[in-house]
Amino acid sequence: MNMLVVENGTILRGPELTPQRKNLVIEDGIIKEITDERAPSGERIDASKLMVCPALVNSHVHIGDSVALDVGDGRPLEDIVRPPNGLKHRILESSPPGMLMEAMRNSARDMITHGIGSFIDYREGGPEGVELLREAIGDLPISGIILGRDPVVFDQEASRAEIRRRVRGVLRVSDGFAPSGMGEITDETASIIVEECERAGKIASIHVAEHRESQRRSLEDTGMSEVERALNAGFKLLVHLTNPVREDLKLVRESGASVVLCPRSNGALSSGIPPIRRMHELGINLLLGTDNLMFNSPDMLREMEYTLKVTRGCARRYFPPVEVLRMATSNTSAFTGTGVIEEGFPADLILVEKLSGDPYLSIINRTESKNIIYLIIKGKLVKR
């Protein structure tokens, strides 16, 4: 039995991240007990001057883009990322596997350095692309939830049987399936993807409403927004929702789907800023991700600070910082199984210096990598 005790820390406990001065008893990677009592044995960390926060979760990243940092700046979004012939796809296809692996591994190390314990990756390249990423991070102390894709979904002439076969092939090695967007696939293909993910008990996710033009095309071609079509197909994890139209947000709320926000990426690509405050008011479960490494570092500390300030600026109203920290931690638990400090959950934690009297703003506004004193993943101390 491996035991680690974190003593006297200010823990951000439960889904609401409630500050409490407690001791954490960790056994075999799991939080066994949260208590006022002193544990009788085990390796100890004195956290009396530290805050204990769930390790951060990057809920949307394309780590394969690590081979194309800052390429294509200023070009139209579709020229850069739209499959199958966007700039990034051409670069990925022409990059040797060894180069891709090294770049992805370096980006994973960067995430670890910045307190990230888990990430959800949207991986191109079919089953081989998924397996390449698994190999790249296999011995690193970070959990990769890898959603794959296959170019067959873009083929208008592919049979239902062929699409189903290829989707199943990806799902055999991945944690889910995530096509680029509703603008590149038919509604029938979208339904097949969701059906196969549900059958396998895996995640079905898709980009929607990232920019106005894709929404306009969807309305003209189908009479429905990208969001409506994605929800009709049954997707439960939507990415971006930067430019909702009509009743999009209410439909998302009614469906129970979660939304991954990527405001730094949206800003970099001049796509707009999602209506974050309105989504929160409607009760939509919001997650946060850094998106393409082409445009952004995979740093959730920077993502949180940008999110808080741009949300307040766009709404011209106060927005609680705890809600932004929840986007990067506890709101992700349904998809990652982490992000919550509570008995029975995995011990994925960061212990950070208290830099101000407000625990949430201290992390969001002021914490840098150097202020993360300990990173604990599955109950083990991680060297950064």
Curated annotation (Swiss-Prot):
Name under which the protein is recorded: Putative aminohydrolase MTH_994
Family membership: Belongs to the metallo-dependent hydrolases superfamily. ATZ/TRZ family.
E.C. numbers: 3.-.-.-
Keyword Hydrolase on entry: yes
InterPro entries: Amidohydro-rel (IPR006680), Metal-dep_hydrolase_composite (IPR011059), Metal_Hydrolase (IPR032466), MTA/SAH_deaminase (IPR050287)
Listed transmembrane segments: none
Alphabetically ordered keywords of this record: Hydrolase, Metal-binding, Zinc
Record-linked CDD domains: archeal_chlorohydrolases
Keyword Glycoprotein: no
NCBIfam families per UniProt: PRK07213.1 (NF005552)
GO MF entries: hydrolase activity, acting on carbon-nitrogen (but not peptide) bonds; metal ion binding
Class of this enzyme: hydrolase
Positions annotated to bind Zn(2+): 60, 62, 207, 291
